[in-house]
């Protein structure tokens, strides 16, 4: 006869003999009792935060552990079988709880799908029940396994007036990327989330197929707002087109720097000698990376690094690289031109970074950059190095931004620091800079703003029983940028006693006819426009809803492109066998967790930055 241990997880068996003792089974049972006592002591204990404050009694919960493990795997792009890897299991049992049971790949996959499903249900409920409108971005990405995916990203202002971004669609698109198929893919996702009558705007890049797609989508989506607001072209894509038009003309001016970088990287011996040289003269040693021919921002980053190391790099190259004519390769003129081009490209790079934000509104900022880029091009139009490049860039600029998109204009006017007065100042400066009249455009913008406000008044006005009078904005001083716009040396807006901008007694008229908000130099950059409108809900109950919708529109599709950065890490060389359904699941869980942490904010291309920063060989040293 044999006896079996009934303790969970134990498969021990013991022999039984007639008349024999059972001491061996007693000892075995006591072993389990001791282990259970130790586990209980570990599993039920006071838990402390890093700052020493108590988080209460911690009790080990295997279900929560599996959920946390699935989230960990999704967020950190770990293998699905990570929970059964010997090293991880040993670490958890040693450092946290000895009763941890390894979690198989199959179990993790099931847990991941449950998490994704629960997250999508919660997101649907939030979007349908508590959100006025949603603006979306979309793009298409080709993966390593020759599978193309389309992403749909929702941008919306929550009931607490925080701007949010969530990936609501990451779908395999196995048909041609024409406009009809793109429209159908977007519509499928929007319909699944019940958002067909809540779409305020759709931001896409400038591909002709996207224009065709919007021709299909506009009649469906124009239920909520206005047709002229629906289709927005990615501002960062346009900035990219403007900057790229200069590359061919800029290349000859920096080819010597490219040659020097290529020469250095072509030999491990040279790289070692360069590191030793930097160590001898006690300066930080950074790797230098060639730019990518079709990416102007990589040229900017290349110049940024090489200019930082100008002294040591120039000295090393000129001492070791001998040209046929005996002249040094990198002379003062080379560096002067490189610095000119770097400073010239900086405006485009910085504007792209700012306009790629996802946790702060960008729709009211783009008019600033449209003006700034126009003035920047005018400043350099007679520069001997950049003459031809600037001409080409101006033609591209005029093609896309001579006519300012109406949404950008309305968003700028809904900035209480600008209103119609500030917008008129921008148009005056822009007219002078690019020699285009905006007299009629200014009237058109005012008419369109009235039209869309009237639609909101009809939709939301009946629910508003009382509208308190508008409170004129107060304060003094503006930053120089505002002073330039308002055409005053003191940056002070004109008096509110001037001729009314808009006749009537409605909210829009009261807002436009009141004084612009004046902010001081210290807090202007930190001005929270969403918070301002939240605080003015009782003053402008209908107009604040319009402002919330307008300010939720992203002017860039970078949020969609950043989803592909996530996808590229999810579908890396080790995971190309993942099914499209599992890719979507991992994406959903990862985005949900990053959204919870508000850690989705990516304003720069992470892969591009990493390609250059990874070339650093030594830590930066403080200057003495």
List where the protein language model places each region.
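C-terminal regulatory segments
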Residues: 163, 169-170, 174, 200, ...
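Short Cys/His-rich metal-coordination motifs, predominantly Zn2+-binding knuckles/fingers
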Residues: 8-13
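Long, low-complexity intrinsically disordered tails and linkers at domain boundaries
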Residues: 1, 35-83, 90-91, 477-479, ...
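C-terminal recognition-helix end and immediately following basic linker
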Residues: 16-43
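Mobile genetic element proteins and their domesticated derivatives, centered on retroelements
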Residues: 5, 25, 88, 104, ...
């Amino acid at each position: 006869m044999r006896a079996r241990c009934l303790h969970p997880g134990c498969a021990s068996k013991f022999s039984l003999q007639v008349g024999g003792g059972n001491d061996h089974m007693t000892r075995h049972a006591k072993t389990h009792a001791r282990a259970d006592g130790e586990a209980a002591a570990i599993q039920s204990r006071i838990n402390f935060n890093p700052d020493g404050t108590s988080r209460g009694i911690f009790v080990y919960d295997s279900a929560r552990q599996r959920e946390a493990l699935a989230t960990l795997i999704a967020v950190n792009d770990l293998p699905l079988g990570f929970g059964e890897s010997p090293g991880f299991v040993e670490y958890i049992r040693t450092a946290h709880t000895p009763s941890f049971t390894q979690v198989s790949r199959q179990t993790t996959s099931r847990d991941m799908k449950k998490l994704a499903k629960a997250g999508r249900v919660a997101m649907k409920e939030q979007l349908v029940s508590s959100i006025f409108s949603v603006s979306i971005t979309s793009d298409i990405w080709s993966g390593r396994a020759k599978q193309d995916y389309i992403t749909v990203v929702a941008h919306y202002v929550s009931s607490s007036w925080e701007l949010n971004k969530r990936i609501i669609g990451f779908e395999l698109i196995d048909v041609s990327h024409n406009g009809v198929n793109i429209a159908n893919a977007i519509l499928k996702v929007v319909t699944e989330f019940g958002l067909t009558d809540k779409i305020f705007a759709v931001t896409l890049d400038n591909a002709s197929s996207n224009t065709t797609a919007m021709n299909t989508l506009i009649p469906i989506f124009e239920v909520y707002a206005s047709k002229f607001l629906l289709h927005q072209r990615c501002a960062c894509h346009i900035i990219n087109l403007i900057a790229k038009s200069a590359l061919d003309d800029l290349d000859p001016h920096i080819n010597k720097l490219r040659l020097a970088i290529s020469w250095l990287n072509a030999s491990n011996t040279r790289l070692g000698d360069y590191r030793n040289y930097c160590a001898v003269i006690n300066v930080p040693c950074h790797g230098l990376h060639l730019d990518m021919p079709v990416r102007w921002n990589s040229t900017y980053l290349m110049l940024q690094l090489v200019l930082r190391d100008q002294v040591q790099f120039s000295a090393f190259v000129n001492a070791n690289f001998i040209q046929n004519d005996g002249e040094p390769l990198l002379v003062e003129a080379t560096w002067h031109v490189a610095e000119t081009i770097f400073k010239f490209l900086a405006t485009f790079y910085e504007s792209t970074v700012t306009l790629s934000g996802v946790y702060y509104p960008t729709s009211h900022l783009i008019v600033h950059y449209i003006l700034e880029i126009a003035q920047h091009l005018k400043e350099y139009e007679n520069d001997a190095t950049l003459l031809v490049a600037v001409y080409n860039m101006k033609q591209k600029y005029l093609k896309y931004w001579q006519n300012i998109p109406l949404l950008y204009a309305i968003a700028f006017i809904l900035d209480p620091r600008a209103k119609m007065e500030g917008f008129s100042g921008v148009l005056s400066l822009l007219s002078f800079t690019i020699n285009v009249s905006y007299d009629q455009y200014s009237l058109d913008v005012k008419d369109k703003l009235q039209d869309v406000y009237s639609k909101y008044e009809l939709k939301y006005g009946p629910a508003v029983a009382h509208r308190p009078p508008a409170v004129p904005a107060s304060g003094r001083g503006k930053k120089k940028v505002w002073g330039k716009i308002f055409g005053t040396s003191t940056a002070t807006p004109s008096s509110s006693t001037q001729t009314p901008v808009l006749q009537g007694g409605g909210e829009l008229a009261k807002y436009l006819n009141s004084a612009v908000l004046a902010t001081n130099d210290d807090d202007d950059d930190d001005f929270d426009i969403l918070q301002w409108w939240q605080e003015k809900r009782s003053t402008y109950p209908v107009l604040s809803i319009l402002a919330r919708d307008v300010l939720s529109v992203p002017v860039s599709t970078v949020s969609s492109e950043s989803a592909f950065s996530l996808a590229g890490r999810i579908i890396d060389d080790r995971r190309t066998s993942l099914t499209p359904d599992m890719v979507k699941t991992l994406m959903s869980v990862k985005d949900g967790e990053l959204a919870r942490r508000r850690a989705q904010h990516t304003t720069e291309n992470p892969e591009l930055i990493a390609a250059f920063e990874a070339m650093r060989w030594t830590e930066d040293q403080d200057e003495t």
